[in-house]
Amino acid sequence: MQAEIIAVGTEILLGQITNTNSTYIARGLAELGIDSYYQTVVGDNRQRLSTVIEIAAQRNDLVILTGGLGPTKDDLTKQTLAHYLNVALVEDQAAMQKITAWFATNDKVMTANNRLQALYPAGAQPLTNHNGMAVGAFYQSENSADFLLLPGPPRELAVMFDSEAKPKLAAAYGEQAQIYSRVMRFYGISESELATRLQPLIDEQQAVTIAPYAKTNEVTLRLSAQAMTETAARGMIDKVDHQIKATVGPYFYGYGDDNSLVTTVINQMIAAKLSITAAESLTAGLFQSTIGSVSGVSAIFPGGFVTYANEAKHQLVNVPQAIIDAEGVVSEATAKAMASGAKQQLNTDVGISFTGVAGPGTLGGQPAGTVWIGLAYRDRPVKAKQYHFAGNRQQIRERSVMAGLDLLRHALNEDTDLKK
């Protein structure tokens, strides 16, 4: 079973609005086990719309059109489809009553063109618009593709698709193989390196699709499998998931489209009841701001320090002036002293520090992008790690924060490993 989604609207082609409708529909089709290999966007032009309808009908079992069902002159979708099907437009009485009632209730004059919103192609099943006026339709054909008409406004489309269209599609096409996907998230490895290391696994896969995607400062893998039940698809993906972790496990930190490294790390710390503070120089509070975005962080984060100037490092977190004079502010010794000093000042379980050169110039002979991150973790020896980041000033600061979170992640995982 194969479907194509056609989004109608010149405003989409001009980039004036984002086409979220096609994304929403595609996800719903995947849940129903209906494949979708094409998505088309076409402007409000009868001839071009007619052409894309004809092309879509030739290569698909189902064609879904969204947009162009309203009362204005550029709303041409249902008229164009009716012409293609060689059927008339008929009125849905329930929709018409709703339209007239709305104008009467709001004491407004109803113009004749509003009646267009109650029309749908003859022979189709009308679909109620619970959040608007334009009626949708599901047309089943014996000799051609089937058609689904949905409104353009996203809040109207979502409700109609979920409550009206999906049940009809399920009833019409019966049980289809379901597509199940899982997103794996990685930090500390590039997309190219991840793909290279997993290439033998990717090449041998037939039942599970492995697709890498580069995100800001991280990489994700989307694993997809198709089976008659979600349980069967999960089983297929579980096997590949295990093989991926066996190959690049140290870089893996979590699952999900909406997950993030900071959410994963802070939730682990909350669960472990480990308190944290930070002393920040080049990041100037960005680490604390980042962890502050996670709900519930107040349970483990009493506060922290922005120690941009050398005097602040000495006064706020007790970094000995002798260390700064001897080793320099961008050094392993200074990073360690900042982390342990912050931890002692607020009596937390963990102290983390950031000192480095955000750029664009050098500092103490150190080039831009040189960063030391210190970590005082529970009763373990204080350590620090050096990094060299590329990018502009803001990118270096953001990458420093991500590296600090990853340093914390590894420390937390060491705790977990020791308990096993």
Curated annotation (Swiss-Prot):
SMART domains: MoCF_biosynth. Pfam families: CinA, CinA_KH, MoCF_biosynth. SUPFAM superfamilies: CinA-like, Molybdenum cofactor biosynthesis proteins. Belongs to the CinA family. This is Putative competence-damage inducible protein. It comes from Lactiplantibacillus plantarum (strain ATCC BAA-793 / NCIMB 8826 / WCFS1).
